[in-house]
């Protein structure tokens, strides 16, 4: 049976004849946080009448963690504080006051209770939890849950093929794109499925002005003449935490950085193209439409190696980006 799901959605491994990149084959962590308590994952269930299921009035985050390669008694989370801050800000769009400190406390306790032994991913989610109908964000209850799953490489580290999507990235004047609002990901899902059913791994979306915006759930970078170039916030992109990390690393490594509009044709003549995201990490792009891109990727590999060293707590210069949790 052929199955493809959108970014971050789950499939069951038994139904797949082979691994398809960009889907997650899930081994869920046994304990989840749901309705203000820690419960077995299989007991965390929502009513079919939950408001957020009908109107997309939820927001989510996602962060990676690994067992510490240098210390078997702790696990490492990458940029935990930034992820919690972003989700707290996203919750404000839902008229929900959820402090970042509360989110962080729950995530830390969740990791301690699960004691993961392999690379993993944490998904916190805030949502309107009332039962019933009528789209609104006032006079309504809110809640949040957190769960985790083991997750290795989400996209092929050797590189992915991308289709230029017929779907366009939404505009900030229509949706709060600085929050990871669940309802907004219908466009990502349409673009992803269009790409995969056409024989590609990923989708690249333009904005309403025809400029490059982002992939289905990742930011995009190109390299031209030694400069690292990426669309700016005015191109209706998500304020990616991995994106921010890459820009900081590049500047500190002496790589010229430019944030500006990127034309579609620039993707085809760039020296290097890569995607970035919490799940995707840094993933090279090897093909766009029927154009094969260069496999010589010195800046992509330099940044990926640097980011890997930081996430594994092997780079003391960026130790404040890594949150260690004893288990």
Task: Indicate where each model-derived feature is located.
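ATP-grasp fold ATP-binding core
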Residues: 119-126
